[in-house]
Amino acid sequence: MPVTLAGQLVVAISSRALFDFEEENRLFEATDDRAYMRLQLERVDEPAKPGVAFSLVNKLLAFNAGEAPHVEVVILSRNDPVSGMRVFRSAKHYGLPIQRGVFTRGESPWRYLRPLSANLFLSTNEADVRSALAADVPAARVYPHSARASSAHPNEVRIAFDGDAVLFSDEAERVYQRAGLDAFQAHERERAAKPLAPGPFKPLLEALQRLQMEPSPEMRIRTALVTARSAPAHERAIRTLMDWHIEIDEAMFLGGLAKGEFLREFEPDFFFDDQTGHIENAAAHVPAGHVASGVSNP
């Protein structure tokens, strides 16, 4: 029987999202891939520093402490295979049990998400992220200069999500951008009992809820909805989650307030939002990734 990842939460991640390869990337952009490969080979025994998504990956892999594996992390990288050696060695140095990887030397690796049945793709490459989202894979462009995750919650995976165009469709956001706040509030008040259509990250939230149900005395998941919505538009968001039989732990209806300082207090391992302004504000405080979906991302 072939090995299968069925039933596991599968996270595909680029090497630059997992580890801090910013210095090496600057050399690549200034020269070529061969100079980059030489530098990575020279540093093959030097563990790379943790990157923006390191804490998220490290904590998710902790769900595998029991006999049955629940989480699989796969490197999906534009790096060359030689540079891939340093990625695997860095993972081993930090005790990350990562065994699988695909290295494509400059080619887009997103097409390998399908045979992996990936639940999430994290990359610093916007084109790859957009391709993944077009293929219905939850994906985000990691901001490599984001603040690193807090170490205050070692036994919790903390993930924060925007609502419209991330967990939910962009239906309401389109009304807001076309007709303004008053029309948006009226639209949502009139449809409070009608669930919103799913957004690109609903499948990930469902997968996280399934993972939370697995017996794990060491780890738990804590989720937050962090949205620019405010009352009365809050009700449709809550009722939509109820209709999906999904529970979240915290909800912040901020009515247009900047999200960054609220996220700083929540201390997530990662935050997902569809608007670059929100991500840039958040990235000063927490690890953040841009979801290039919906009307704000033509």
Regions found by a protein language model. Name each.
Residues M1-V11, E126-I159, G163-E190, K202, ...:
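Asp-based, Mg2+/Mn2+-dependent phosphohydrolase catalytic module
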Residues P2-E107, H153, D162-F253:
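Alpha-helical substrate-recognition element adjacent to the catalytic core
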Residues L76-R78, L122-N125, V226-R229, F272-Q275:
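Short His-Asn-centered micro-motif
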Residues Y94-P97, L116-S117, A135-D136, W244-E247, ...:
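Short, structured coil segments at secondary-structure junctions
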Residues Q99, N119, V157, D249, ...:
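Conserved acidic residues
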Residues R100-R105, S123, A140-R141, A251-G255, ...:
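Short acidic-hydrophobic, aromatic-tinged amphipathic segments that line or gate anion-handling sites
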Residues W110-R111, G260:
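Short hydrophobic/charged patches on amphipathic alpha-helices used for structural packing
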